[in-house]
């Protein structure tokens, strides 16, 4: 019990108020970055980029160079098979499109952007004000949107650590006495040593689903986050290198819906049981798409390079700069940085390690001093991640690794396995050991459905007959009509009637338009078009059907969660029912009209606004598939049952280049049966006639 108590006291409650969760106070303007030539003296600096931007009526030049050491050369990606087997990959990742720089030759004004998709996306700071830049959709002139990032009154609800200074000192003493890797560095030289953080990240299942079940998108997200984190850690001469990423693509392997304090402990225990010291890492973080009330993150204090080098971050925002700030703050705790208090300064109003969420990019003098007390005693921080090695490839650990066909575990388990032998190769006659297209150690025949469509906006996938893996999950492209007047959006056919039924049960339906007009123009918790963390936004008339869902014909109130409140109001003999949404709640607002819900002909709701369906940019058009199919979410043609991909121009059996080959149409099978029957009849007749001829002769 004492040991358990000690372990629990070895963390720092890095709890933040969600006040200041990254948002945009207003659209500053539309800008068109102009590429300019960079010179240093008389020579053009290789790899550097410069763009001219006109922001707020002033011309600024941002100068950037590629960020090196963003991802290790031997980057490891872990995913899971549908049967729960851990799969290891050495994944190639594009990492030459991430940049760091500055504005107008001011080295104190950071620029953190990426150009991976041919445009600028990231953050920059001008005269102490932070801005987010992102590409404008549907533009052919390289237009970008520039927003001012506003954190509001971030001190209005500060959350601070509950540990006393004496308890913190005891923890630090205990950590140092148990530290396995110590390296004393003379004080005068410590800052000249460049440090590397080998960063291991785990993404939970909700985040994977939120990113459309796309592993590549998850990797791209993490690179943007790590690029942002590196922008903060440049000032302390530290490279944060993404060495390992695990995606819980099948399910969560711990319960992330408990308190954040329990989740942190469970995650660290899971990490030690799952990997131990087999995967080298200095810090490991779990990023979850889960709200924890007022808390955005939690991490153990000063435990970098120890078995308790863990942290948890709630990533409910899709703004990568916001997520990077949360991760950087939690990583600071792993480095030994406490929350800033009186006397801590960085030249700005707030610093990065403030107890509440800010947009500050700078560490305080206190953070520097606290970090020094840790980094001088951690030799692991001076290892170069490019030399990363892993000894995880061990036959018999039930993990299918590179070079293995299967892994059935110990000898006893392998005796019961019909497909896999104890030396991690397939048994004679076996084609496979796992996978949605594997049955009885054999590949399922081509055309066997391995993933049925979940709903009318989904698409099926079929086995190809030569692989145990089912093709990746694809679905109908956003904007395709569904259920009469609806449109498919992110694999769902969003409709107000259906949303009302999900909230209030069968029989309920979307209310009369007067409910939307009266309620959503009030701008309160029961009727609004979103909020700015301090005030609710009143819906414009054109957007009222995209605000809070308003329902009628509610027969029986279903049991809701504790933080949810049902509200009803009468207008013109109509009872309008809706759900409220409180400030400080970090889960999705279930009472908001779902993105993708149809508004009017060729219009949908997106982010509480009525927008043209044309915002759903697609490179796939009816002309591309010759009017004989539909587009999928990868912008490829999914052909009808009698047409052949990729362009549905020739006769075939349907499907797409992403779905696998569909089965032979039943009509074709019937024709084959008919032909065989006719042939059999003909053979019988010929034999009969031949026999009759011989007898008559």
Curated annotation (Swiss-Prot):
CDD domains: ZnMc_adamalysin_II_like (cd04269). One of its GO terms (molecular function) is integrin binding. GO terms for cellular component: external side of plasma membrane; sperm head plasma membrane. Residues 188-671 are extracellular. A motif (Cysteine switch) lies at residues 159-166. Glycans are attached at residues 127, 214, 365, 391, 464, 506, 531, 573. Its EC number is 3.4.24.-. GO terms for biological process: cell differentiation; proteolysis; spermatogenesis. Residues 392-478 form the Disintegrin domain. Binds 1 zinc ion per subunit. Residues 1-22 form the signal peptide. Sperm surface membrane protein that may be involved in spermatogenesis and fertilization. This is Disintegrin and metalloproteinase domain-containing protein 26A.
